[in-house]
Amino acid sequence: MNCRFRFSLIAAGMMLAASVQASEAKYASSDVPHLAPEKQHATASTRVASRYMRSHYKHFTLDDQFSGQVFNRYIEMLDYNKSFLNVTDVEQFGKWKNQLDDQLKSGNTSAAFDIFNKVLQRRFERYQFALTQLNTEIKFDDKDDFVIDRSELEWPKNDTELNEIWRQRVKYDALNLKLAGKKWPEIQKTLIKRYNNAIKRLTQTHSEDVFQLYMNAFSREVDPHTSYLSPRNAEQFQAEMNLSLEGIGAVLQVEDDYTKIRSLVAGGPAASSKKIAAGDRIIGVGQEGKKVVDVIGWRLDDVVQLIKGPKGSKVILDILPEGNNAKSYTVTIVRDKIRLEDRAAKSEVKTIDGKKIGVLEIPSFYVGLSEDTKKELIKLNDQKVDGVVIDLRNNGGGALTEATALTGLFISSGPVVQVRDSYGRIKVNGDSDDQISFDGPLTVLINRYSASASEIFAAAMQDYGRAIVLGEQSFGKGTVQQHRSLNHLYDLFDKPLGHVQYTIQKFYRINGGSTQNLGVVPDISFPSAIDPAETGESVEDNALPWDSIKPAGYKKLHNYNTLVPILAAEHQARIKDNMEFGFINEDISTYKKEKDINTISLNKKTRVAEQDKDDSDRLARLNKRQKALGKKPFADLDAVPKDYEAPDVYLDEAVAITADFSNQKQS
């Protein structure tokens, strides 16, 4: 993305050739397929509807009201940013709004295909228009602002408004390339290829794509963890469950033509690189020794195929971080087999004010975690640690049995979690071995991305009074899903029907409260730029609500009601003048000021000035750290080592609180 173009007679010739190419798309309207349901879709549709209504934890009625919700979701999934359809299109689709419930039950998918075919044509028209905008060089001197997120705006009234949206969209794409150091001929060539590739992918759309999208519009209206997987995606899911894929260890999704990183697999290559984060966008993928391919607008499965490869090989990714004015950068990652056993728990000892504090990092609840943790605790006990921090940040969960077994390492016996099914039946999972692996001061560090099994463990430690929970409010994913094939043994279809994943149970703490939606609220909260009102289960549409049941029979081990305020006061005094927490508070302030800004300038000077300020602020922060460490300042950002890591101030503070905890226990 950073290669430069030297002007010459050859360059001028290439520019002219590109201009001709721009006005002539490689595909005609007739190349866009008119898709129709396949024979197996009727049966699959009725079975999906029947399965959800009969077996889902959430009891719902598939009626006209629910039909309207599915309709709105389907339109949103087809044109989330309201940049392809106009208001007349949407009004015409409205005839189907109250009919989808009956169609889902009967297996009639005609509405879904009629709507999808219209959207395909509208997408073709928009990309055709985008190509015409590349006939002449785009200038970035005017005052012009691009609306980034149009989802809450009204639908465009007509093609004139859509044309203006796309004029700005093309200018936005071109300016991003300009800011990455490209000259106009290369910008033109890149965007011509990008938009023609987008049209090409329209021509490669299959009926299975339509059916999967439609079924997921239905599924997401039931709850956010319910989904339909097409036969191809179901096969990929099984491969992942068998741990046979080799790649970078990232969960991807498509959002407004971008391949976005939804989450990172703990212990995987991407997470280990520490250069990629959830929310980042992959805009280019290249193989070792080959040119990076622009993947904006690509199908997700095609991007995944580019990223996957043999273990030990390298993949080059162009990354555009989250944020309106972010600068892209390139990361090289060595592919590896993504195996659960590679995400093992590990421990280390940190010394603070004469106290030895063990830190136990648990990236996921893999099978065998409790046994690994027991071994690590033996090591920590041998080193006579004064306390232990269990680090569950970014731990998305895993095996429920391991959450129960892990809890058992810190209590003698007792209930750990309650599980209720859709019939109201409650099962209590607990520990009964009467053995404790560590009985000293214990803290649990969580963040907003600690979910599921992580929340079960943290909640149990909190309810028993066995540990003090630190950090951020956790994610709030307190449900159990089941994965089932739609096929029956007696089916005679040539093609499989796909699979469904749906919610069947809900978790409850031993105090009776659910972890669903609310998550676990820490005893001592850390400053964070992550707003629980904007991230987590509670933000998801149709998330199951928090509720409570009767508490399980358990005995509280400790009551820290008087100790927590003392530790919290020491924590506040410590971070008040702490430089790193000062940086965090600056970030929180900046985020609050900028989070509702929904436009970005298309003026080059303005954008360059914004980026220069961001770079200057970052360099100043880095050099404040260097000065505090007694090290030489960086001359510029290029001088910063590629493997530079910022201090883990949250973990450092958790260690300090645990040391305070140990002191208080001794006194």
Language model features with spans:
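Gram-negative bacterial Sec-dependent N-terminal signal peptides
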Residues: C3-Q21
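Acidic/histidine-rich, surface-exposed loop or edge segments in extracytoplasmic proteins
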Residues: A25-P33, S45-Y57, K95-Q99, K193-N197, ...
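Cleft-lining beta-strand/loop regions that shape enzyme active-site pockets
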Residues: A36-P37, S50-L62, K200-S207, D223-E235, ...
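N-terminal-proximal low-complexity accessory segments that begin disordered
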Residues: P37-D79, V87-D89
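PDZ/PDZ-like domain segments forming the peptide/carboxylate-binding groove
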Residues: E76-M77, N98, A112, N117-Q128, ...
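Extended, domain-scale alpha-helical bundle/helix-rich regions
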Residues: R122-G247, Q253-D256
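Conserved functional hotspot residues or short segments at active or partner-binding sites
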Residues: A180, W184-K193, R509-S667
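Polar, glycine-rich mid-to-C-terminal structural blocks
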Residues: G465, L470-A533
